[in-house]
Amino acid sequence: MLESPHIPVLPSEVISLLQQTKNPNPQWFLDGTAGEGGHSKLILKTFPEAKLILIDRDAVMLERAKKEILKEIGSLDRVHAFQMNFSEVDSELLQEVGCPSLDGALVDLGVSLFHFLHSGRGFTFKNDEPLDMRLEANIGGKTAADVVNYSSVLHLKKVFWEYGEERWALKIANNIVQTRHKKKFGTNTDLVKLVEASIPRKFWPKESHPATRIFQALRIEVNEELVHAEKGIRALAQCLGIGGVLTCISFHSLEDRIVKWTFRDLKDNGPFEILTKKPILPSETEIKENRASRSAKLRGLMKINPIKESRWEK
């Protein structure tokens, strides 16, 4: 199947925030979620003298991003690529590539459209695929099938409620446990059918599939997305140089809540300033051109000089 060209979310808004860096000659940026390389290409074009640390936890996505950058920029000479989680970024990694500190960083917390349409890992409802959902499938770790087949009713209920905000969490969890005694869940289709049967049709959401919240919850659980989001935001904030900017794009309320609260905590307890009093949202035009952007929210944070002159000092 022919893939549609990738369109990065809030592209000009991300660049506008990164351009607020106080370094008049910015040298180092980091894209913590390379994805299809859309934002990375914009960063490299906007800052032609800068180098980019390119990170993605999915080896497939990292290679796709590098390929896209090479195609459009013509070279990977300014790119240092690593397969890892952005929550693992630290001063040692920066030292490894000769980076003293970051002038700007971006994390896009959404899952790539590629994962839903082409990964074959069970993120979608449309194709019959293994119930996997791992973003680091080449490294190992638990799958969505493991969670569904071996978790207790209470744990499943907690996952579905806390990560999916699913009102039918307990009923779905009970039905899963009853069903798996007869046959283990192996594919996404198995789970979709159970969720559809568990929720009365009159309560199905009008604008999304009834299994959307369950699949979101399992994906978050399998990949520990919210844990890594907070840890990663804190890690990248510490890697900023004075005047450096961190930008975060979120796609649902759980992610945005973590970004908002973590930014606020960093501001209250460290040398940071929030650049976005309210999240930046996509325009109506962007939403029409790129439906994937419709729930996106962008927030920005700057590291400031911790030494402030007292107003009483002369």
UniProtKB/Swiss-Prot annotation:
This is Ribosomal RNA small subunit methyltransferase H. GO terms for molecular function: rRNA (cytosine-N4-)-methyltransferase activity. It is an enzyme of class 2 (transferase). SUPFAM superfamilies: Putative methyltransferase TM0872, insert domain, S-adenosyl-L-methionine-dependent methyltransferases. It comes from the Bacteria. S-adenosyl-L-methionine binds at residues 37-39, 56, 86, 108, 115. InterPro entries: RsmH, SAM-dep_MeTrfase_MraW_recog, SAM-dependent_MTases_sf. NCBIfam families: 16S rRNA (cytosine(1402)-N(4))-methyltransferase RsmH. Signal peptide: none annotated. Belongs to the methyltransferase superfamily. RsmH family. The keyword Cytoplasm applies. The lineage of its organism: Bacteria, Pseudomonadati, Spirochaetota, Spirochaetia, Leptospirales. One of its GO terms (cellular component) is cytoplasm. It comes from Leptospira biflexa serovar Patoc (strain Patoc 1 / ATCC 23582 / Paris). It holds the Pfam family Methyltransf_5. It catalyses: cytidine(1402) in 16S rRNA + S-adenosyl-L-methionine = N(4)-methylcytidine(1402) in 16S rRNA + S-adenosyl-L-homocysteine + H(+).
